Each structure stands twice: as C-alpha cells, then as structure tokens.
Amino acid sequence: LRKVPADEIKNRVMHILDLVELTGMEARMTNQLSGGQQQRVALARALVIEPSVLLFDEPLSNLDAKLRVSMRTEIRRIQQEVGITAVYVTHDQSEAMALSDNIIVMNKGVVAQMGTPQEIYYHPVSEFVADFIGEANFLKGTMDCLDGDHAVLRVEGHPARVPAKEGMEPGKEYTVVLRPESAALRDEGGLPCTVALSCFMGSYQNYHVTVGNTLVKLTDYNPKNKRVYQVGESCSLAFDPESVHIL
C-alpha cells in the first residue's frame, strides 16, 4: 500500500530490529516473546513506516514495575537516536519526567501548565500541577513582612522564611509547596512538629509529621548514621527557603 520496494522494506525492517535490539528474533511467534520484547515489536512496527510524529498512548500500563522502568529507558534512547517527534500520553508522573523534553499537564481537558520537566516540578502554577507531578506538601501561611528577598509567613502560628514573589502583601494567605526531599527533621530551629510515621525504606527514611493540623511527608535520603526520629517524638521541620515554591 505504501509502494515501498521490496529491498528497501527488508533493509528498513533489519535496521529497526537492530535499533530495538530484536535482531535474530525475526521468525519468532508473539507467544514466544517476553512482555518487553512484545512492546519492542509494537514500537518497531510503528517506526518502520518512518512517521513524522509518533503517538504513545500509555504503552507501558500493562507491564510490571521493573519492566516499565527498563522500557521507558529504551523508548527514550530510541526516540533520541531516530530523532522523531513523539507525543507520549501517560498518567504516570515518573514516565512523564523521564521521557519528556516538554510536558503538558491536562486537567479535565484543559491545559493546566506547559513547560520543561524542571519548570513543571520546581515552579508549578497551581496545587493541582504540584500534586500531579511528584509528591508535594502544602503549607498555608499568612504573610507577616518582607525580609530582603524573602518573606516571613506565619505557618500554624510559627514564622517561616520563604522566597518573596512579586505582589506579595502582608496579611494575605499564601501556599508553600514543599517537596518531601527538600525537608528535614531537626531537634530545633524550624517549625515545631510531631512524628506520626517513621519508616526505614533502605536507601531512605520516610517520615510523616504533623505541623499543627497539617500532615507533612518527608524523605530523608542516606539515613545511615543519622538520628532516626520515632513516632510520637517532638522535633522541628526545617527546609531551605530556596527549595520551596510559593503559590
């Protein structure tokens, strides 16, 4: 139907099989391939016709977690090697971050934000976007005053320094977006809190703490030789003012 000469068809097929690392498996039936190999066959079929744009509609949703990570790495490698424009539809935030040069976050059919993965993650325009891309804590605070390039907010009755943004006014309420990896627990010097969950996960320690009536999630990487806070302990929630985003 595409009127491609037989020799060119063969050359394209062999090139694409090599690209998706399926050389030597040309004669195998579908039921003789693993889940990951079947995904590569589907990708090869799409690439061999040399489309100008390739649409992926949640292609990894039926694979197990480890295979998903492996396949998204392969898809990114192949996309960059071929140089094709790809539109990748997914509800998996980690896939979106790992595969994209630019991300469009949709909310009920409307574009909520468009930008690079870094822009979306570090500078979300709304709570919806912040919560959709990665985990996020939201601390409500009323502005006390400006302090140079920073503002002082009252969070659950306690002062917290955050980056000042244009148009901030004393007495108005703002939302602090705090990522779990940007927060830390200290004996003192931060927002008073109480540990609600302390869970060792191998390479990191998960904490849930309550700051007043607000639950905050923290991820403490490389916990070896660090103090581990236990459930019920009182301590302080600390963060670098430059690591948070204000809405």
Language model: regions and residue ranges:
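ABC ATPase nucleotide-binding domains
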Residues: 1-128
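Glycine-centered flexibility sites
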Residues: 24, 35-36, 109, 115, ...
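Non-catalytic connector elements of ABC transporters
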Residues: 136, 146-247
